[in-house]
Amino acid sequence: MQILRYTLIALLLMVATIAAAQDLQTQIQECEACHGPGGVSTEDDVPSLAGVDATELTNSLEEFYFYERHCTTTTYRHGDRPKTPLNMCNIANVLSADDRVALGEYFSRQ
């Protein structure tokens, strides 16, 4: 029960941190912390974002936003971010519709 409590607290803190990110570059860095620099993943369980069609990426973020996709809990893989648990539904939920489109467009060009 304690582990669940600490996990939920960590997730809430992570969501609050992501929600505070206002500019696209900060949001890109958040994505790259799991999906790798430039959106090129080196992890078997984390997909690459680079070069994927912008509409497909945006639609995926929309599906996470509306909890229409399974949201596996994972941790940041790259950079100096704390290795606290998080999932794509919570991440997508703090992004505006414009943010989701902008991120899809950015990673499609990588």
Where are these regions (language model features)?
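Bacterial N-terminal signal peptides that target proteins for export
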Residues: M1-L8
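C-terminal capping alpha-helices of c-type cytochrome domains
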Residues: L11, N90-Q110
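N-terminal signal peptide c-region/cleavage motif recognized by signal peptidases
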Residues: V15-I18
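Sequence context surrounding c-type heme c attachment/ligation sites in exported
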Residues: A21-E32, S41-T42, A50-N59, A97
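Structural micro-motif
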Residues: Q29, T84-P85, R100-V101
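The canonical Cys-X-X-Cys-His
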Residues: C31-G38, L103
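Gly/Gly-Pro-rich "capping" loops immediately C-terminal to redox-active cysteine motifs
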Residues: G39-P85, C89-I91
